[in-house]
Structures are given as C-alpha cells and as structure tokens.
C-alpha cells in the first residue's frame, strides 16, 4: 500500500521535514484536510518571498491553454490496486456509486490481511461480489524458525477457500517482506524460504501484487538537489543504512519472477522505476509472467509526457490501471486526465505532493483499452477456481 495517499489527504504542509501540522491531531480525514489547508493559507499570507517554505509553495499556472475535465474514463476500467478504504456499509455503497459514475467496473481490494482480519473485510464487501475482489496477505509467523512454509501455505489455501482471489499487497522496501502488520525482517522475495509460498500462489491461480522499493528520491540525499524533496522527506530511506537499495530490490523482483514462472506477479507502482522506464521495459521483456500496475505513480510520470507515452505505447499489454489513493471522484478524474488528455503544465496539490507541473500523456485508444481493462481482464480470466 502506498501510504502517501493518506498524507496527501491529511494535508502535506507541516508533515514533511518534521514540521507540526493540524492534520497530525485531527480526528478525521476531513478535519485534517481542512486544518492543514487553513494552516497553509495563514503561512502563505504572511510569508515573504525570502521566507516562503517549499512545503507551502502552491503555484498556479498562468498559461491560457486548454483544460480538460474528465469525469468518466473513456473506456471501462478495472482498478487493480486499491485497499479497504471504505469501513462501513454506507461508505462501501458510496464507493460503488462513485465507481458507476467514473466508469470503474471492478476494484481489487488488496487487504494485506490473513486470518480473522481478512475474513472480516471479506464479509464487509460481500454485498458487491461483482464489483470488489478481496486479495489476501501472507502469514509470516515463524519465518525466522526452521520449517517455515507449510503454515503460510495452509493459511493461503484457507484464505482462497474464504474468498481470496489473489495476494497483495506484499511489501519489501529493502528491509524484508511485510504483509500488513506482519513483518519478516531480512527475508526478501527471492529467499528460498518463500519458494513454496510463491509456488502455491501459482498452483492456486492467485496473482501476486508485489511492492518492491520506493521512488528514487527517497534514497537520495535530502538536500537542494533532490528533485522530489517535498514528497521524499516523509518517506526517506537515505537514513537507513544496510537496506537493499532500489536497484537491488528490482534485481530481487526479477530473480523471484524468473524462479516462479507459473506464478503471475504484478509489480506495484511501476516497480518504482518511474524514473527509469527504459529499465522497466527491459525487466518486462525478460519476465513474461510479470505485469506492472501504474497506481500512485501518475505525478511521477506526468512531467515526462512524451517519453512516458512512448513507454505506454510499447508496453501497453503489460501495464494495468490502479489507483491506491482512496475512492473519491476527483481522484479518479485526475488519473484519467493524465492518461487521456494532452493538457500541459497543470498542478494538482490535493492528490500529489510534488512541486512540479503535470502534463497529459494523450494515450491512444488502443493503449487505453489495454491498460484500463483488457490486460486485467485477461490476467484475471486465467485464474483457477
């Protein structure tokens, strides 16, 4: 799960770089959002150009150019990366209404959970079996003891019987695997202890949503040269010596997919190679059982629209749509605007935390159909049971 979505909703100002924020003490997302907005307004009203902080920078484009509002996707969509954001029946009903209005046919709920926690989420969403799919996590209990594996496999099989259709989101940002609150420090996806679990996923026909590393800016020095500093600081990894770096985690991802060709893997967030799409293309070419979801990496690719559009065109059959940013309609709309329009130099501070301007990629209808729906539909149709 990309927790930055919650930071975006709570208000960026004051969270990054250790600054205090009304959002940190708010009882609800709405209160946090309103409070942070008020704080930012007060700061910017009193700040001079010499004292204005980068975190309070809220530029507005001066260009008189077309602005495209896209309320509904051009083609039907399957969202391959979301989480159980809706906690009540009423919220789930609202989510379905939003999906209807924006053109989302089905959403994958990556619960990251096992046991009773998974069962409870499954029950909550059972009202809409055609609109939501539950994906479970892994049970890493005893991972550091001899004989790990059979227990995790048994719980995976139980979750499948309870309604799980896939696995995710499984994390490894360099310190070891994590599935929700369950952690396995030092055990990475290519560890032999995981072989039986990955093989069972393939045997059960359960695709795996695997999140490796984090964006490149989190690994760089937090200084004036860091292009993504506004978003990087809160999630920084440069101060954690000994972790596997971004490139090393991508190597681990490749070794894992190569060893388990009968298992389908989905690399979350473009495998965090949004800054090096050429390498991601090479990884996809070498691994036919690997897809990449584009969730929560819209702001990272929108600054390079021509190169990103070329990448989407070349690898359209290996990319799947995802959000990972809640379920409100404006959130869906900004993803559609980036993918479909040719808009230039616009800002989006409600969903993203970067300072730079965004651009539409203007993807072809052929690419949109594949990324929005066809790839996911084909991937899901290949499953067993």
How does the language model describe each region?
Residues 77-85, 209-213, 267-271:
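Histidine-centered catalytic micro-motifs
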Residues 84-92, 109-119, 141-150, 188, ...:
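Acidic-and-aromatic substrate-binding clefts and catalytic sites of carbohydrate-active enzymes
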Residues 22-63:
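C-terminal segment of N-terminal export signals and the immediately downstream linker at the start
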Residues 44, 61, 88-89, 96, ...:
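H/E-rich (His + Asp/Glu) clusters that bind or coordinate divalent metals
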Residues 44-53, 59, 65-68, 119-236:
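Active-site gating/metal-coordination segments in enzymes
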Residues 6-27:
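N-terminal export signals
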Residues 65-89, 93:
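Mature N-terminal segment immediately following signal peptide/propeptide cleavage
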Residues 77-82, 94-116, 132-139, 165-172:
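Divalent metal-dependent hydrolysis catalytic cores, especially in the metallo-beta-lactamase
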């Amino acid at each position: 799960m990309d927790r930055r979505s919650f930071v975006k909703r709570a208000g960026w100002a004051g969270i990054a770089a250790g600054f205090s924020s009304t959002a940190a003490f708010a009882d609800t997302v709405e209160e946090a959002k309103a409070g942070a907005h008020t704080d930012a307004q007060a700061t910017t009203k009193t700040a001079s150009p010499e004292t204005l902080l980068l975190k309070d920078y809220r530029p507005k484009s001066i260009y008189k150019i077309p602005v495209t509002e896209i309320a509904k996707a051009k083609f039907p969509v399957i969202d391959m990366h979301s989480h159980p954001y809706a906690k009540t029946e009423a919220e789930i009903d609202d989510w379905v209404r939003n999906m209807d209005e924006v053109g989302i046919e089905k959403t994958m709920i990556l619960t990251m959970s096992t046991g009773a926690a998974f069962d409870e989420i499954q029950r909550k969403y059972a009202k809409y079996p055609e609109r939501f799919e539950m994906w479970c996590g892994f049970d890493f209990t005893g991972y550091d003891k001899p004989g790990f594996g059979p227990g995790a496999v048994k719980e995976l099989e139980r979750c499948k019987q309870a309604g799980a259709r896939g696995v995710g989101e499984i994390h490894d940002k360099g310190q070891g695997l994590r599935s929700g609150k369950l952690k396995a420090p030092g055990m990475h996806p290519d560890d032999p202890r995981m072989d039986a679990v990955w093989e069972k996923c393939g045997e059960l026909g359960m695709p795996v949503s695997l999140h490796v590393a984090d964006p490149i800016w989190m690994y760089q020095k937090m200084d004036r040269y860091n292009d993504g500093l506004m978003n990087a600081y809160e999630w920084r990894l440069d101060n954690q010596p000994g972790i596997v770096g971004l490139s090393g985690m991508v190597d681990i991802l490749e070794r894992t997919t190569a060893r388990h060709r009968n298992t389908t893997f989905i690399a979350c967030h473009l495998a965090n190679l949004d800054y090096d799409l050429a390498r991601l293309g090479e990884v996809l070419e070498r691994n036919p059982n690997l897809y990449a979801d584009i969730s929560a990496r819209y702001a990272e690719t929108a600054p390079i629209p021509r190169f990103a559009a070329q990448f989407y065109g070349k690898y359209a059959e290996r990319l799947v749509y995802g959000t990972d940013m809640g379920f409100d309609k404006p959130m869906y709309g900004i993803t559609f605007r980036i993918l479909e329009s040719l808009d230039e130099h616009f800002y989006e501070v409600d969903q993203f935390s970067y300072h730079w301007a965004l651009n539409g990629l203007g993807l072809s209808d052929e690419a949109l159909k594949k990324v929005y729906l066809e790839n996911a539909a084909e991937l899901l149709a290949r499953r067993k049971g």
